[in-house]
Regions:
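N-terminal export/assembly segments and adjacent metallocofactor-ligating motifs
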Residues: 1-342, 349, 598, 602-605, ...
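Hydrophobic alpha/beta core scaffold segments
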Residues: 419, 433-463, 467-476
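Active-site phosphate/pyrophosphate-binding segments
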Residues: 288, 310-416, 527-536, 540, ...
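Structural motif
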Residues: 196-198, 258-261, 363-365, 422-427, ...
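Long, C-terminal catalytic modules of enzymes
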Residues: 489-552
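A short, gly/pro- and small-residue-rich
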Residues: 268-288, 436-452, 487-490
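Flexible glycine/proline-rich, aromatic-decorated loop/lid segments
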Residues: 457-491, 823-824, 829, 895-911
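Long, low-complexity segments enriched in small/aliphatic residues
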Residues: 529-620
């Protein structure tokens, strides 16, 4: 019998009508919620959707584990650990011997796109299991991002390259050395002509020295750099403004007003962790303290834009014209000749006045993907406003050899095509996959007689090279790295290479006739040559211990703006959109395409990391896929939407319309996702998906946007044609899961209103009196643990989610299971909108277990599997749980997770290498949830008892709290009135989630406070 069609199809007209009503919902999670489709609400109101409550399919354990790869099937590793032979130095103290059950922490650093952050890595009996930020490192300040947190999973990934191969046959290291020696002997007579080296962005001092030595030995050889996430526009912009390469560093702790020109400085780019810390510390509404105001102009919603007091959606190509208009208003550019800001005159005038009024205490930050002119105008504006030396300083470049990387790669491609390359050594990267599509890098690569590739995975580039060398993970190798401010760190390994991988230093040593040297010797010898005076051994050990090399931060330099570039008589600069359209001959109805790095898989290098693939993206909440992001108005014009299936066999699945994108003869099909706040006429594609040789997790996931990315339009294109195909594609989106009912869950106001009424967050709501409760009153004689989460600080970066997953052995479940609402994350970040459909204000709300004092889950469990501890924790006793799921049904916060399958493969001994031994691995049929990191509480209690003292405030730091760069999460003893968490809970903007239910949650929230400009509209944003 055919099932009736009960799909919840999105109706954008109904959404707009609802928003225009005065009685409409003020805060909303999704477009479907506003459309008030009854089938959609049926989906939300059912605690366990049909496919999440019945085992309807025949997925067996063996079949399911194929989805897990790195998270579940670490069968390629030995169960024993392999410690490095060289002496590594643990952070703070070095015990005489390893104590079983007692973790050690080692300082190291992780480099991404040429910029490093300092880390402390937790090691259990020689096994790295968890990554934390190094509080002494200027780029991390103790915080981390999702990539650092997930890097430990990549370390144990069984899909990593495990053997050195020649034409896919396994060969020993000695065979490669012999081949290289013969090849170099033939090149040496010609000074190395025909030798090419391709790297990603290099900031390692030791690697830079090795490359310079190699080029000195082979003067006719060439070194090329290419990074798909490269900073070519930023480099070109500073060179245009100042005549040479320099490195801008922003001091946001001194900024009263910030203007972001398509810049997501809180979530990505060099120094983003520090910038997030500095920004949020100035966003707390403290008496007598000024609160930073943030303006954001962007084409696609970002984490930074979500935190803005005023956000202006605008096509990426139009931002250059706006920057020029702003420069003219502020005396930093030509007084006339551009109308780039004509459509937003009122908005631009108010921003210009605000910047003028805060001369010397404001800053303009250009986006990494914006044009060189936008960067140059931003520097000119900062110079004109007197910000240089205050909110922005300049140093010498952090990179070892800053170049135009696109031109560098283009030169290599031309040489390969002309047959001028005889030996190509590719150190890292995957140019066959991510080079500009018009370069046809794979075809040109096959013209090179000898090709060698060093990489973590046997990827698309490795497949076209004769020699593939397995690369050692950064937790397995010695190296060094530089942070955004030039601070150098020694990268020290915590475990010997699991697959006999080689570091980049060891591979280059083979090209300089020193193949016997280890990475440890190479790095140590370099720093010994740089050390002058004093005891080198003491210097070396201190550098390893601290995680930074003292005195290596680059000092500020004096620099002058190029007067011949921004002179008053210069001709007006055409907008990037005009330039592109004049070249491509685009039609008015054509769309602009914007390329962005994926918030989870980055440029594609993390595609095989299951933690990151299953991580809900901050704004879209998509997992295991990418989509073409469009505005509601664009979706209406194209006639595209999505539907939520409400039929029995597909209950809860999202099916999005598929469109065909055509640009310069290149065609790509992708599903569409509607994003409130997206610039109209602009389509955003996230890079990093559609891999063909990523591994069992990442291969075939999503669509490859690199196929539309050309050298002439790396970050934006105009003239792209979109066609509706009539097909639909299933997407795994979590924004429809775990819906909470009740009063507005997010509470926010303006700074002006907050100062008039500090208690706004609790107006009209009073918690029921304790004596009216049917629950027994708990008596607490000792510590009483609680948490406060500041909604004014959280910008939705997701670091806490991955940190929780790594700390608590939380498995991934795969795309199909996510579509059934079975994801296992203990901590979720709900995203809420407020205001208009086309430009809403965005808020993020982390939701862990509330650890209620009157916990609804405890009273319904028939076997006492969820109980109340003496310190107020809502504990889980896993071996009692029989899987009734009554507790989850009765939880108003929807924070409990059930193991419908045996998601965690605890039978595989090698999996112990990854897992935290202090946390129980759960089995099928067991409920689980946030525990407030009870293992960390117990460890601190044991230490305090040994020293006969109470637990100090701040001694216990939960995994989510430790990872957060914004310090949005604070944990501690609420019975201590002097503790930080108690002081936060005493603030008037502190409120309980669903407090009217009398659950008395231990986790509470601090309401968000925005700082809008009175000249501009805030709540009902006009978008002018």
């Amino acid at each position: 019998m055919k099932m009736p069609n009960r799909d919840a199809v999105l109706d954008l007209a109904a959404v707009r009508s609802h928003l225009q009503e005065s009685s409409g919902k003020e805060y909303w999670r999704s477009l479907d919620e506003l459309a008030e489709n009854p089938h959609f609400f049926e989906l939300l109101h059912r605690e366990f959707p049909r496919q999440a409550s019945e085992w309807l399919d025949g997925v067996g354990r063996r079949g399911f584990l194929k989805l897990m790869a790195a998270s579940l099937a670490l069968a390629g590793l030995n169960a024993c650990t392999r410690r490095p032979k060289e002496t590594i130095v643990p952070y703070v103290r070095a015990p005489e011997e390893v104590v079983p059950g007692k973790p050690l922490f080692f300082a190291t650093a992780m480099t991404l796109a040429g910029s490093a952050i300092g880390l402390l890595v937790e090691s259990h009996e020689g096994r790295p299991t968890k990554v934390e930020g190094n509080p002494d490192h200027p780029a991390s300040l103790g915080a981390t991002d999702v990539f650092a947190q997930a890097s430990v999973l990549t370390l144990y990934d069984p899909d990593r390259s495990q053997v050195l191969t020649y034409l896919e046959d396994i060969r020993p290291w000695s065979a490669l050395l012999g081949h290289v020696r013969v090849a170099l002997d033939g090149l040496r007579a010609r000074g190395g002509a025909g030798l090419r080296i391709l790297t990603e962005t290099v900031s390692s001092p030791t690697l830079a020295q090795q490359l310079r030595s190699l080029l000195a030995e082979f003067p006719a050889a060439k070194w090329h750099q290419y990074e798909p996430a490269g900073r070519d526009p930023a480099r070109a912009g500073v060179r245009r403004a100042f005549g040479r390469y320099v490195n801008p560093i922003y001091r946001l702790e001194k900024a009263d007003v910030i203007l972001a020109l398509d810049a997501d400085f809180l979530s990505c780019g060099p120094g983003h962790l520090r910038y997030a810390r500095e920004f949020t510390r100035r966003r707390r509404p403290q008496p007598g303290a000024a609160m930073t105001r943030l303006y954001s102009v962007e084409c696609t919603p970002s984490n930074t834009g979500a935190m803005a007091d005023h956000r202006l959606p605008m096509r990426a190509s139009e931002i250059e014209g706006l920057a020029l208009s702003l420069a003219a208003r502020l005396g930093a550019g030509p007084a006339a000749g551009t109308d780039g800001g004509a459509a937003h005159t009122e908005w631009l005038a108010a921003v210009a006045r605000d910047l003028q009024q805060h001369r010397g205490s404001c800053v303009v930050i250009p986006g990494e993907q914006q044009s060189p002119d936008v960067h140059a105008w931003a520097h000119a504006i900062n110079h004109a406003l007197g910000n240089v030396g205050s909110t922005v300083i300049y140093t010498e470049p952090v990179e070892a050899a800053p170049v135009d990387q696109l031109e560098s790669l283009s030169e290599l491609v031309r040489d390969m095509d002309a047959g001028r390359v005889e030996l190509l050594l590719i150190l890292g990267g995957n140019p066959v996959y991510n080079a500009p599509a018009d370069f046809a890098f794979g075809e040109r690569l096959l013209k090179v007689p000898t090709r060698l590739h060093l990489s973590l995975y046997a990827d698309e580039t490795s497949a076209l090279c004769q020699w593939h060398i397995p690369e050692a993970h950064y937790l397995e190798a010695w190296s060094d790295a530089r942070a955004y401010d030039g601070t150098s760190s020694i990268v020290q390994p915590l475990i010997a290479p699991l697959y006999n991988g080689k570091s980049v230093h060891e591979v280059l040593a083979a090209f300089t006739d020193r193949p016997e040297r280890s990475g440890y010797e190479i790095v140590r010898d370099y720093w010994k040559s740089q050390h002058s005076g004093g005891d080198f051994e003491q210097f070396w050990r201190k550098s390893l211990n601290d995680g930074i090399i003292a005195g290596t931060a680059l000092p500020p330099i004096s620099i002058s703006l190029q007067t011949n570039w921004a002179g008053g008589g210069s001709a007006p600069v055409a907008s990037k959109r005009e330039v592109i359209e004049s070249v491509s001959g685009s039609k008015p109805e054509a769309f602009e395409i914007v390329f962005r790095l994926d918030p989870a898989v980055f440029d594609g290098r993390f595609a095989n990391n299951g933690w990151l693939q299953e991580l809900p993206r901050p704004l879209t909440k998509l997992t295991w896929d990418n989509a073409a992001l469009v505005s509601p108005a664009t979706a209406e014009r194209l006639g595209v939407s999505y539907r939520i299936s409400a039929t029995g066999g597909e209950h809860g699945r999202v099916f999005a319309d598929v469109v065909e994108l055509e640009y310069q003869g290149r065609v790509l099909e992708m599903p569409v996702w509607i994003v409130p706040g997206q610039a109209d006429g602009c389509v955003t594609l996230h890079l990093g998906h559609g891999r063909k040789r990523a591994g069992r997790v990442g291969t075939g996931v999503g669509s490859n946007a690199y196929t539309l990315r050309t050298s002439g339009a790396l970050w934006m294109t105009s003239g792209t044609i979109l066609r509706k195909t009539g097909r639909q594609h299933p997407l795994a989106c979590t924004q429809f899961h775990h819906n909470m009912e009740g009063r507005e869950l997010v509470r926010a106001t303006s700074l002006e209103e907050y100062r008039r009424n500090p208690s706004f967050a609790n107006e009209g709501e009073a918690e029921p009196p304790k004596e009216l409760s049917l629950y027994p009153e708990h008596k607490y004689d000792g510590n009483a643990w609680g948490m406060a989460i500041d909604l004014n600080a959280c910008h939705g970066c997701n670091a806490c989610v991955v940190a929780c997953q790594a700390e608590n052995n939380i498995p991934i479940v795969g795309k199909t299971e996510v579509m059934r609402g079975r994801e296992m994350h203990w901590l979720r970040i709900d995203r809420y909108y407020q205001g208009s459909l086309d430009n809403p204000q965005t808020y993020f709300q982390p939701v862990p277990c509330m650890h209620c004092e009157n916990a609804p889950c405890e009273v319904v469990c028939p076997v006492g599997a969820t109980v109340h501890s003496a310190e107020g924790l809502n504990d889980m006793v896993y071996n009692r749980c029989v899987g009734t799921r009554y507790c989850s049904n009765n939880c108003p916060y929807k924070v409990r997770r059930f193991n419908f399958f045996q998601y965690s493969d605890w039978e595989t001994p090698s999996l112990k290498l990854l897992r935290n031994p202090d946390v129980t691995v759960r089995s099928r049929g067991v409920m689980e949830k946030c525990t407030y990191c009870v293992q960390r509480i117990n460890a601190a209690r044991i230490e305090a008892d040994k020293e006969n003292r109470p637990i100090r405030d701040g001694e216990i730091v939960t995994a989510c709290q430790a990872a957060c760069p914004a310090e949005a999460i604070v944990f501690g003893n609420i019975r201590d009135p002097q503790s930080r968490v108690a002081r936060l809970k005493a603030e008037k903007r502190n409120y309980s989630l669903l407090g009217g239910l009398n659950t008395r949650p231990r986790t509470t929230y601090l309401a968000a406070v925005r700082n809008p400009n009175r000249e501009l509209e805030w709540v009902k944003r006009s978008g002018r």
